[in-house]
Amino acid sequence: MTSLDPAPNKTWELSLYELQRKPQEVITDSTEIAVSPRSLHSELMCPICLDMLKKTMTTKECLHRFCSDCIVTALRSGNKECPTCRKKLVSKRSLRADPNFDLLISKIYPSREEYEAIQEKVMAKFNQTQSQQALVNSINEGIKLQSQNRPQRFRTKGGGGGGGGGGNGNGAANVAAPPAPGAPTAVGRNASNQMHVHDTASNDSNSNTNSIDRENRDPGHSGTSAASAITSASNAAPSSSANSGASTSATRMQVDDASNPPSVRSTPSPVPSNSSSSKPKRAMSVLTSERSEESESDSQMDCRTEGDSNIDTEGEGNGELGINDEIELVFKPHPTEMSADNQLIRALKENCVRYIKTTANATVDHLSKYLAMRLTLDLGADLPEACRVLNFCIYVAPQPQQLVILNGNQTLHQVNDKFWKVNKPMEMYYSWKKT
């Protein structure tokens, strides 16, 4: 027994944990305990490379395990100490190989290549979900989705407004004139064909009128030819004017009923006279009225679009004011009410002047509450009991030696416009009130 005792100059000092812990019971039967690989990871991991131990080396002094290459490199390039507990390691002679631990690892993980493949998959999945690049990609995808949805929303609103007001465009394509009694029904004449008919009729009437004028000026022609030309022109003009006038007026009424509301509905033009000289004016008036109605429908559609956009952007004014407009403030104690003998000033000492930069839509009440909270946090126990309840009055000095008390619901934007029109930090004063 004496041979097993440690040498007198080499004593093993037990730690508090080793002194207090109870020994674990030895398993003597065939009981198996299921242990997850994650719980074993910290035991089988090298503290230097954070990977599974390879060619395990154990320190003789503190019994910490490392990979052979890792600990040799650490001793060669760093301090001569254990990377885990900083105990002194002189050289490689302070290490010993641990083949039993390598055998244990090989029993748990027979194939190291399979283990490394699993670890690579886990790290790849982790990088996809948790890395900085994944965050950037997620933000970019969100911006793309927002940019795609925004034009679709505006196009839908524009199409809904244009469908009601665009009666003179595609809406007039399927408008049919009411049939006369005993006459066949006309279907599928659009607005461009109607304008083409009006232009053709006006050109025919102009050519007939010009031919009549030339024959009247030419004395060499016989009276019979002139009379026949006049008769043919007069016969053609009433028929064409009557047909075109009836179809135009009926079509205009249908288009007006379909496109214009009752308040802006235009009345149909009267049927022109049989004279051929008024025919071009009739065509021009029809075109002018159509253009004016198109402009009215476009203006109505623009009004709808503007209304929709106003509804979408409603409530953004205050946000833009609070973000874009910032005001710098210099808070000073009131020169008379917050004199040197004031309890709060004695507690504040050199912290009585405050420099603040805030948004323009902040109110005077916000500043008062900020001062109360800030001074309470800064002073803490130094704040006298009489000053525990902090109520402040806020003043502004538009002129030297002139202090104006401010209302609590006034915003800094209003105060700046009314009292302070100088491009420098606004000077404000505060006084402590007991009530």
UniProtKB/Swiss-Prot annotation:
Residues 309-322 have a biased composition (Acidic residues). A zinc finger (RING-type) spans 46-86. Signal peptide: none annotated. It is found in: Nucleus; Chromosome. SUPFAM superfamilies: RING/U-box. The modification Phosphothreonine is found at residue 267. Residues 144-322 are annotated as: Disordered. SMART domains: RING. It catalyses: S-ubiquitinyl-[E2 ubiquitin-conjugating enzyme]-L-cysteine + [acceptor protein]-L-lysine = [E2 ubiquitin-conjugating enzyme]-L-cysteine + N(6)-ubiquitinyl-[acceptor protein]-L-lysine. Interacts with ORD. Component of PRC1 complex, which contains many PcG proteins like Pc, ph, Scm, Psc, Sce and also chromatin remodeling proteins such as histone deacetylases. This complex is distinct from the Esc/E(z) complex, at least composed of esc, E(z), Su(z)12, HDAC1/Rpd3 and Caf1-55. The two complexes however cooperate and interact together during the first 3 hours of development to establish PcG silencing. It comes from the Eukaryota. This is E3 ubiquitin-protein ligase RING1. One of its GO terms (cellular component) is PcG protein complex. Pathway: Protein modification; protein ubiquitination. InterPro entries: RAWUL, RING1/RING2, RING1_RING-HC, Znf_RING, Znf_RING/FYVE/PHD, Znf_RING_CS. Its EC number is 2.3.2.27. The modification Phosphoserine is found at residues 202, 266, 269. E3 ubiquitin-protein ligase that mediates monoubiquitination of 'Lys-118' of histone H2A, thereby playing a central role in histone code and gene regulation. H2A 'Lys-118' ubiquitination gives a specific tag for epigenetic transcriptional repression. Polycomb group (PcG) protein. PcG proteins act by forming multiprotein complexes, which are required to maintain the transcriptionally repressive state of homeotic genes throughout development. PcG proteins are not required to initiate repression, but to maintain it during later stages of development. Keywords: Cell cycle, Chromosome, Meiosis, Metal-binding, Nucleus, Phosphoprotein, Repressor, Transcription, Transcription regulation, Transferase, Ubl conjugation pathway, Zinc, Zinc-finger. Changing residue 65 to C: In Sce33M2; induces extra sex combs due to derepression of Ubx homeotic gene and abolishes ability to ubiquitinate histone H2A. GO terms for biological process: anterior/posterior axis specification; follicle cell of egg chamber stalk formation; germarium-derived female germ-line cyst encapsulation; heterochromatin formation; meiotic cell cycle; neurogenesis; protein ubiquitination; regulation of transcription by RNA polymerase II. Pfam families: RAWUL, zf-C3HC4_2.
